[in-house]
Amino acid sequence: MERFKKASSIIETLKQQGHEAYFVGGSVRDLIIDRPIGDIDIATSALPEEVMAIFPRNVPVGLEHGTVIVLENGEPYEVTTFRTESEYEDFRRPSSVQFVRSLEEDLKRRDFTMNAIAMTEEGEMVDLFAGQEAIQQREIVTVGNAADRFQEDALRMMRGIRFVSALGFSLETKTKQAIETYGHLLEHIAIERITVEFEKLLTGTYCVKGLKELVETKLFSHLPYLQMSEERLLKATQYKWDSFETDIEAWAFFLYCIGEEHPSVFLRQWKFSNKKIKDIVAVLLAIRTRKEKDWDTVLLYKTGIYIAEMAERVYEAMIESYNPTSVKRVQSMFHALPIQGRQEMNVTGNDLLNWANKKPGPWVADMLQKIEEAIVKGNVVNEKERIREWLQGCNLL
């Protein structure tokens, strides 16, 4: 409750000004579940302009949605006006938002009952939709009619399964049936938004359970490049998923598990940046080599520590070893390398031109590459004169 106490002064101030205010959303849910608390959000009857007048230190980030960030005790808090939403457009966004003075109206528009619990600054729960009961039953239940909630915003179906992966809860029967019925509406949602939810699913503690729900609800058939992948996804659930340190590792492991032969094509369908695609593919290539042989100095140098660490963690997950010393061993090997990048070489192309008394050409790059590999292998010390002597001894000058 310590973090809530820090934010309680905002609620107290709003109440002193004649407004209602409560803690809401994921932070309240996680407090009940006893999970680490993320951002603390506050809902209030005060209109955005009233919030800004009461708290001069603010950032008006989403006034059309009633959200103002209030800076209090050195922390930013989202303060959002109670609101209700009209008919939704394209199964993803409300055509308009109306500010209201009723907490109940605000809570009833939310996705799942566990996310529709409010809490006073004293820690008293306002639970109008049996959210605590759902948490106790470890069930994910929509607020009100599941069909209505998913037709309002089809992304809620992905969010539901993402929560299965994060919390280990199960989808309540009617909620699950509604996903099976309305899964096709997911095709109205921007790929980028789906990718965010799927990535959270892959990094969840109960990822296997989430993947199984994805298959059982047939929601996978509306995801990029997975339309005909039921068997591949079931294959992925047979692996023991670890909690990876990065999303790059989670995607690499997922692609390995489903046996994806064209990872770059697959990832482009999910609208990833070129940098992220490059990193995931690099991890997969490093794993392929790692399966054939252990790390050596040249392989580690060429791979680089950033990719090598991730590849080693994924490789450990693949063989279900989870040896905590394996990544440390890779780190120690890398830090023991004579150089960790070409920029650390104590010789330049100009040095080679002077020593050889030859015109510039492709031979300079070839020679630098030979020297680089020799330094990494320990065949020559990374000192200019020693490198010159080595070149002469090898008849390369």
From Swiss-Prot:
Binding-site list for ATP: 26, 29, 110, 153, 156, 159, 162
Positions contributing to Mg(2+) binding: 39, 41
Keyword Ribosomal protein attributed: no
Keyword Magnesium found: yes
Chemical reaction(s) catalysed: a tRNA precursor + 2 CTP + ATP = a tRNA with a 3' CCA end + 3 diphosphate; a tRNA with a 3' CCA end + 2 CTP + ATP = a tRNA with a 3' CCACCA end + 3 diphosphate
Enzyme Commission number(s) of this protein: 2.7.7.72
Enzyme class at the top of the EC tree: transferase
SUPFAM superfamilies, sorted: Nucleotidyltransferase, Poly A polymerase C-terminal region-like
A Pfam family the protein falls into: PolyA_pol_RNAbd
A GO biological-process term: tRNA 3'-terminal CCA addition
GO molecular function, a single term: ATP binding
Main function: Catalyzes the addition and repair of the essential 3'-terminal CCA sequence in tRNAs without using a nucleic acid template. Adds these three nucleotides in the order of C, C, and A to the tRNA nucleotide-73, using CTP and ATP as substrates and producing inorganic pyrophosphate. tRNA 3'-terminal CCA addition is required both for tRNA processing and repair. Also involved in tRNA surveillance by mediating tandem CCA addition to generate a CCACCA at the 3' terminus of unstable tRNAs. While stable tRNAs receive only 3'-terminal CCA, unstable tRNAs are marked with CCACCA and rapidly degraded.
Family the entry assigns: Belongs to the tRNA nucleotidyltransferase/poly(A) polymerase family. Bacterial CCA-adding enzyme type 3 subfamily.
The protein's assembly and partners: Homodimer.
Other noteworthy facts: A single active site specifically recognizes both ATP and CTP and is responsible for their addition.
Protein name, per record: CCA-adding enzyme
Gene that encodes it: cca
